[in-house]
C-alpha cells in the first residue's frame, strides 16, 4: 500500500480524519523534491549561525551555498567538538556552535572516554521532533484502521539525568520529551493506558508495576503493545511472570499494592483502580499460572494488532522471543532517530522486520552520506560525501549530519544501505552502528572498550600466575534481561595449577563491568536493562579450533584474526561445548547520575 496512491484516490479511507489527510499530503510534498528542501535547510542553518565561533574558523564569510560549505567545513567526529561542547557545558553562553541558546544536552548512547556524549539542543528542536512524531499514526492508520478506537500499552520510562556545571540539563532524548510541557499537557490518556504519573516516576519498579497494572485493567481497550527497545517489552513480560499473583490480588481487592508509595501514582490510581474485579483477577490467574507462555500477549490482550518496537540492526536478535510471546504478531519499526537528530520514518510499517526501510525527511537536518568503502582509519575527503538526492540504490553509506543546533558535518556512525525511493526521497535500511561489538539495549560497547575491560580484569589473575591468552564475546539476548558473555582461554605459568576460584573469577566479572562505559553501567544499575556480566572459561586450544573452523569455511590463514564478538550458531556451539566453568558478576558496578564535567 503506497501513501501517494491512497492520496491520489482522493481519500485514504472513510475514517481518515482531516488531520491525517493533511499529514499524508505533507509526506508527499516533502519527499517530491528533497534536493530543493536540503538546499533551503542548509541555507537556513548557515545564515542563522554565521556569527558562531565554529563557522568563523573556516572563513565562510557569510556563504550559505553547498559548494563553499563542503569545501571549507571539515567532516568531524565527537572528539573534534569536545572542547567546544565542554565550554558550553561549563556555562559559556557565547555563540560557539549555535546562535540560538543551547537549552539542554541530549545524552547519546555512544560514549567518549567512557562517558556519554553530549548533543547540543535548542528550544525549537522539540518542534521538529514532534513534527515527525505526528506523522506516525496517520501512516499506521493506513495499514491498521481504527487504532483511535483503542489504546496503546506502551512501557515508557524516564531515565536518570544530570545537570552540567554550567546549569544545563543532560538527559536522554525521550526523558527530555516526557518531561517537556508538550507531553505534560498532552491528552496522553486517550492514547496510552499508562498514566503520566507512572511514566514520569523515577523508580522503574513502581513505574513498571503501575503501567502493567493499568494495561491489565484496560486489557480489552489495548490494540497495540510497545516499548522503545524490544528488550523493554520482553522485560515487561518477565515482570508479569514474576508479579502476576500480586497484580491479580490488587485487581481482586480493588486496592493498590503497598509496594507503590509514590504519591502522584497513588493519587492517580485511586481513580483507575477503584473497585474489585474478581472476574478479571480469576482470568489472569488462569492464564498466567500456565507453564506455557507462548502467545501470552494475545491471550491477555486479544485485540492487539501489532507490536510497536524497533527490531532493526542489532535489535533483530530479539525477534524470535517477541514472536514466541506474541503468537507471531507483526512488528512495526516506525521511526529512525537519535539524540543528534530525528531522521525519518517507515512508510510501510507492516513489512517484515528484515524489509524495514526508513524514508529520510529532508527538512529535519542537512544530510550527507559518506560512501562506506573508504579506509576507516584514514582521513575523509570533505568533498567526497554524497548529497541526499544523489545516493545510489544498493550502496552503503555512513550518515553525516548538519543540524540547526550546531553540529556541522558530524559523523553519526550509522551505516545505512539505500533500498529505494519514496517519490524522490531515498529510503534506507539500517545496517549497523559503526565499530559496535556488543549491545543489549541502548548500550554500545566497541572493541576498545572490551579490550580495556579484559585487560583490567585479567590483572586480578596475575597473582596466581594466570593470564588471558584469547577472548571473544557475544550479547546474550535469550535471557531476560540480556547480558554480556565473555569467553576466556587461560594460561597458567604452572601447568599443574588449578583454574582460578569462582570467587576470583567473579571479581574479574565485576572488574570488567567497572571498566565498561557509563551507558552500560547505568543500564545495569539504574535501568536494570542488562543482567550480570558472565565469563565462560574454555578449554585450552579452543581458539585454535575456532581458527581451524573459520579456515575450513574459507578464511585465509594469513589474514585470520580472532573475532572479538561472535554470533554464528556453529561458532557459538563450538565455544559452549568447550566451556569448563562459568562465572557471574556478584554485584552491581559503580554508577552515579552525576557526570564528570
Swiss-Prot record:
Q: What is the induction note for this entry? A: By auxin.
Q: Which GO terms describe its molecular function?
A: indole-3-acetic acid amido synthetase activity
Coiled coil segments of this chain: none
Keyword field contains Heme: no
The EC category is: ligase
The protein's matches in InterPro entries, at most eight in alphabetical order, are given as:
GH3 (IPR004993), GH3_C (IPR055378), GH3_M (IPR055377)
The alphabetical list of record keywords is: Ligase
A Pfam family hit? GH3
What EC numbers are recorded for this enzyme?
6.3.2.-
Q: State what this protein does.
A: Catalyzes the synthesis of indole-3-acetic acid (IAA)-amino acid conjugates, providing a mechanism for the plant to cope with the presence of excess auxin. Strongly reactive with Glu, Gln, Trp, Asp, Ala, Leu, Phe, Gly, Tyr, Met, Ile and Val. Little or no product formation with His, Ser, Thr, Arg, Lys, or Cys. Also active on pyruvic and butyric acid analogs of IAA, PAA and the synthetic auxin naphthaleneacetic acid (NAA). The two chlorinated synthetic auxin herbicides 2,4-D and 3,6-dichloro-o-anisic acid (dicamba) cannot be used as substrates.
Task: Give the family from UniProt.
Answer: Belongs to the IAA-amido conjugating enzyme family.
Report what the protein is called: Indole-3-acetic acid-amido synthetase GH3.4
